[in-house]
Amino acid sequence: MLQVQGLQIVMKKDLRQLLQGFTFSLQPGDKAAIIGEEGNGKSTLLKLLYDPALVEEYVEWSGTVQKDGMILGYLSQELTPQEGEMTAYEFCCQDPAFWEYTPGELAEAAKKLGFPMEWFYGDRKMKSFS
């Protein structure tokens, strides 16, 4: 279970408050959506939930975050120059978790996401995807 209680996030540079008193919990299998205008802290919230060290340079935060055995992942919105030159297959191969799945399981996941398998095994570079 992922449980967040009384989360407050404040930007260090201008003291702008992104969240105040934010509380929620997710059980295994639950789904959630974070919707908001650009620049209002959606990515900051996700980074903080994944690893608070990712945001410590630019925000102050308080509250509690309990992951209780949940495995979280975070995929940055921007690729490094090296990642941009990789194919989708090369990019995925970097993550040890990738090797825990059979080709059939990967194909099923790609199908659910609407991701054509030829994109995965083709020569198209990561930087060309939107």
Predicted regions and their residues:
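Conserved beta-strand
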Residues: 4-7, 14-30, 63
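Helix-to-loop junction immediately C-terminal to a conserved catalytic motif
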Residues: 50
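Walker A/P-loop
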Residues: 43
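Conserved ABC transporter NBD signature motif
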Residues: 58-72
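ATP-binding Walker
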Residues: 40
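The feature captures the beta-strand-to-loop junction immediately N-terminal to the Walker
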Residues: 35-37
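ABC-family P-loop ATPase nucleotide-binding domains
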Residues: 10-13, 69-71, 76-130
